Amino acid sequence: MKLTVLGGGGVRSAFLAKSLAYNAHRIGLTEVVFLDSSAENLTIFGEIARYVFNAIRPDIHFSVTSDPVPALKNSHYVITTLRVGGDESRIRDERIALAHNTLGQETTGAGGFAMAMRSIPAILHYCRLIEEHAAEDAIL
């Protein structure tokens, strides 16, 4: 089974790669693709993730790409780890909230709400691509 990670160029990608590698047998993984719109992030964090994954499971194909079509083609599982707007948007969201004496945390506070609103168009875009290119029974 193929698994695709949307946002695979994030700073925590190596940790996700390690967990996937150690648990690949549980879901029958045969291929893992880390996708990110930032080629720069993929060059750094995606390649670290590839190294970690291949050190544990060299028998499973692992790749990184910034092209969503081949990344999603025939994928059975899709994980989203997107941060639309990058770290700059997170910092701005949290500072705006804090300036108004409000919790700015990126998942539960005003920063999280801002991130969710910013993410909707990207998630809808990927959902259309998943519907078109992923396996018919893909799980998002």
Residues of each region from the PLM?
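Short acidic low-complexity segments
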Residues: 61-74
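Redox-cofactor binding/interface segments in oxidoreductases and associated redox assembly factors
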Residues: 73, 79-80
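Rossmann-fold NAD(P)-binding glycine/threonine-rich loop
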Residues: 84-140
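Phosphate/oxyanion-binding active-site loops and adjacent basic polyanion-contact surfaces
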Residues: 9-13, 40-45, 115-122
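N-terminal Rossmann-like dinucleotide-binding module
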Residues: 3-32
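Residues at the starts of beta-strands that form the adenosine-phosphate
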Residues: 2, 30-31, 61, 139
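Short, well-ordered amphipathic alpha-helices
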Residues: 15-22, 46-53, 124-127
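NAD(P)-binding Rossmann-fold cofactor-contacting core
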Residues: 25-52
